[in-house]
Amino acid sequence: MSTMPHFSRTLVTTALPYANGPVHLGHLAGVYLPADLYVRYKRLKGEDIIHIGGSDEHGVPITISAEKEGISPRDVVDRYHAMNLDAFTRCGISFDYYGRTSSAVHHATAQEFFSDIEQKGIFQQKTEKLFFDLQAGRFLSDRYVTGTCPVCNNPEANGDQCEQCGTHLSPLELLNPKSKLSDATPELRETLHWYFPLGRFQAALEEYVNSHEGEWRPNVVNYTRTWFKQGLNDRAITRDLDWGVAVPLQSAEAVGKVLYVWFDAVLGYISFTKEWAALQGNAELWKTYWQDPETRLIHFIGKDNVVFHTLMFPSILMAWNEGKTTDCYNLADNVPASEFMNFEGRKFSKSRNYAVYLGEFLDKFPADTLRYSIAMNYPESKDTDFSWQDFQNRTNGELADTLGNFIKRSIDFTNTRFEGVVPASVTKEEWDNLGIDWQATLEQLDSAYEGFHFRDAATLGMEIARAANRYLTSSEPWKVIKVDREAAATTMALSLNLCHALSIALYPVIPETCNRIRAMLGFSEPLEATIQRGTSLLSSLLTPTLQQGHKLREHSEILFTKIEDSAIAPELEKIAKLIAEAEKREAALAESRIEFKPAISFDEFQKVDLRVATVVAAEPVAKANKLLKLRVQVGSLTRQVLAGIAKHYTPEEMVGKQVLLVANLEERTIRGELSQGMILAVENSDGKLFIVQPSGEGINGQSVQ
């Protein structure tokens, strides 16, 4: 089995969900269920582990939600913190502590970090231009600005990202910017902000990430390295807002400013651990989990949060640790970021209500059916898809027919024919001859959980159930008992011990069900009550546990009720409606793109300088999955042009192509890259782009007539 002798304990954190809406199944699959599977398994091993999570209660999305509803940000976060904590609890996500970044302890912790780093002279102050809403009398953070995306012409792009094409933006890049507060056109004004110099820590961060190559998932390492390749830039650490952690300075420049949520939120892991420690009656206990090198720190996140946990948070901790010999923080030993789980072939989208929300799901179906379905579809190395049909099939075919059927048959037959007691003793030899290599299974389970391969772990548990079913069916105790009661008794004793083994092996995945199995087996306490640090319950798989004479509970129960077609029909109707609405929006947007623009005169058209150009080099643009950076030859000149064609052409396909270039288009900067023109392309009804090219070989630089 996997062992880590250099770690005495483990601290698991999970990404903080924004408290401005309910969590959906995509969040559960990517972050919270895998963390819970891991934590529950480590507890079974008797290890010292705590699971810390909580709500991210600051940031622009929350203030926007509050303003839309005409309530305070506090009202918004109170509602969704309670809602999400309730959903997590009902789903069996076993946090040791679930905190809030609006707490006094968190504010003090975040301000302490800011002050420490500020006193070291690490922060930089910069004056920048931001949009200011004259009617509202305030600066506008990125999400308070909307406008037209410069890449795909989506007229409803946000100031931080275009949801349609995925391009990350700044408000200044939007065309026709408008304030979300007043719908007025904002003006640019100067404002002073504090910046964190990420580049100062790049060498240390690269060494840190490189030291974990081979341990971390390739997607985590590779994505982080794309940031290194670009070079790490200064990052704003303050914002002009009135909701958040106030900048702890007395200067006039700090008035009306709060800490940027990227800096504030990750420190919640620390402040929440402090609050947990206080509840244990030892206010200093948190230091053992954050500052003792014997503690292993693991961040469970989705892939959209990678850089915040491989670059941002580590650099903050490095800045704190700088110049200290005590009170230094540990950096994460692993960051097992998941890919995305989509919903019926499309990405989850809260803004478009294309989602299945966790609380609503649990109102209709048992938590363990969802936990199992997602574990078996865990997006470890590639995106996966949740579908109602798959959920129904797994519940009915695997949980009900395989696991539930075996448990009920074993207990019912024992209650009926053997007075509800384990009817025989079972030897180690008989246990080992069941056709299950218990030692190998235990090692495979350990490898799966310790390696964050949760689909493999769930599959191993279900394989035990299949083997148990095969054993009981092939042994036919209902026939054998008529001629050999002793043999039938041995079969049932082995079957009941298999029930117990399943209650251990599948516990991390379906904990409520496993405790129900234990109750039917006659155990008075749930498994959680028997867990002790230093004692592994997994070793009970190696030998039969239930001895002859052990009393079962008098009545069994059906563990899983099959899901009828009628139960998921409303969900399928709902998703069909959502897809139809999405397609309608997309069609309307497509139509809006082909509306004729206002007429121009011939003289105005003559001002457009169209030239034949040849692409001589092409490469992707980091963090903009629709853009290619092209170098084009125009006569004797070379130009750099950014084109939104990366979904339709590879860089290799573009090199050598002749294109038509708008050569006198005003230069602009997109995602930090200069674009000196525009190439022409057309879009078909399926949304595919085609480069407009000369029908014959043109001459570079030749004017288009």
Curated annotation (Swiss-Prot):
<keyword id="KW-0436">Ligase</keyword>
<dbReference type="InterPro" id="IPR023458">
    <property type="entry name" value="Met-tRNA_ligase_1"/>
</dbReference>
<dbReference type="InterPro" id="IPR009080">
    <property type="entry name" value="tRNAsynth_Ia_anticodon-bd"/>
</dbReference>
<dbReference type="Pfam" id="PF01588">
    <property type="entry name" value="tRNA_bind"/>
</dbReference>
<dbReference type="GO" id="GO:0005829">
    <property type="term" value="C:cytosol"/>
</dbReference>
<dbReference type="InterPro" id="IPR012340">
    <property type="entry name" value="NA-bd_OB-fold"/>
</dbReference>
<dbReference type="InterPro" id="IPR002547">
    <property type="entry name" value="tRNA-bd_dom"/>
</dbReference>
<feature type="binding site">
    <location>
        <position position="162"/>
    </location>
    <ligand>
        <name>Zn(2+)</name>
    </ligand>
</feature>
<dbReference type="InterPro" id="IPR014729">
    <property type="entry name" value="Rossmann-like_a/b/a_fold"/>
</dbReference>
<keyword id="KW-0067">ATP-binding</keyword>
<feature type="binding site">
    <location>
        <position position="350"/>
    </location>
    <ligand>
        <name>ATP</name>
    </ligand>
</feature>
<dbReference type="GO" id="GO:0006431">
    <property type="term" value="P:methionyl-tRNA aminoacylation"/>
</dbReference>
<keyword id="KW-0820">tRNA-binding</keyword>
<keyword id="KW-0479">Metal-binding</keyword>
<dbReference type="GO" id="GO:0004825">
    <property type="term" value="F:methionine-tRNA ligase activity"/>
</dbReference>
<dbReference type="InterPro" id="IPR015413">
    <property type="entry name" value="Methionyl/Leucyl_tRNA_Synth"/>
</dbReference>
<dbReference type="Pfam" id="PF19303">
    <property type="entry name" value="Anticodon_3"/>
</dbReference>
<dbReference type="GO" id="GO:0000049">
    <property type="term" value="F:tRNA binding"/>
</dbReference>
<dbReference type="GO" id="GO:0046872">
    <property type="term" value="F:metal ion binding"/>
</dbReference>
<dbReference type="InterPro" id="IPR041872">
    <property type="entry name" value="Anticodon_Met"/>
</dbReference>
<dbReference type="InterPro" id="IPR001412">
    <property type="entry name" value="aa-tRNA-synth_I_CS"/>
</dbReference>
<dbReference type="GO" id="GO:0005524">
    <property type="term" value="F:ATP binding"/>
</dbReference>
<keyword id="KW-0963">Cytoplasm</keyword>
<feature type="short sequence motif" description="'HIGH' region">
    <location>
        <begin position="17"/>
        <end position="27"/>
    </location>
</feature>
<keyword id="KW-0547">Nucleotide-binding</keyword>
<feature type="domain" description="tRNA-binding">
    <location>
        <begin position="604"/>
        <end position="705"/>
    </location>
</feature>
<comment type="subunit">
    <text>Homodimer.</text>
</comment>
<comment type="function">
    <text>Is required not only for elongation of protein synthesis but also for the initiation of all mRNA translation through initiator tRNA(fMet) aminoacylation.</text>
</comment>
<keyword id="KW-0862">Zinc</keyword>
<keyword id="KW-0694">RNA-binding</keyword>
<feature type="binding site">
    <location>
        <position position="152"/>
    </location>
    <ligand>
        <name>Zn(2+)</name>
    </ligand>
</feature>
<dbReference type="InterPro" id="IPR029038">
    <property type="entry name" value="MetRS_Zn"/>
</dbReference>
<dbReference type="InterPro" id="IPR033911">
    <property type="entry name" value="MetRS_core"/>
</dbReference>
<feature type="short sequence motif" description="'KMSKS' region">
    <location>
        <begin position="347"/>
        <end position="351"/>
    </location>
</feature>
<protein>
    <recommendedName>
        <fullName>Methionine--tRNA ligase</fullName>
        <ecNumber>6.1.1.10</ecNumber>
    </recommendedName>
</protein>
<dbReference type="Pfam" id="PF09334">
    <property type="entry name" value="tRNA-synt_1g"/>
</dbReference>
<feature type="binding site">
    <location>
        <position position="165"/>
    </location>
    <ligand>
        <name>Zn(2+)</name>
    </ligand>
</feature>
<feature type="binding site">
    <location>
        <position position="149"/>
    </location>
    <ligand>
        <name>Zn(2+)</name>
    </ligand>
</feature>
<dbReference type="InterPro" id="IPR014758">
    <property type="entry name" value="Met-tRNA_synth"/>
</dbReference>
<keyword id="KW-0030">Aminoacyl-tRNA synthetase</keyword>
<comment type="similarity">
    <text>Belongs to the class-I aminoacyl-tRNA synthetase family. MetG type 1 subfamily.</text>
</comment>
<keyword id="KW-0648">Protein biosynthesis</keyword>
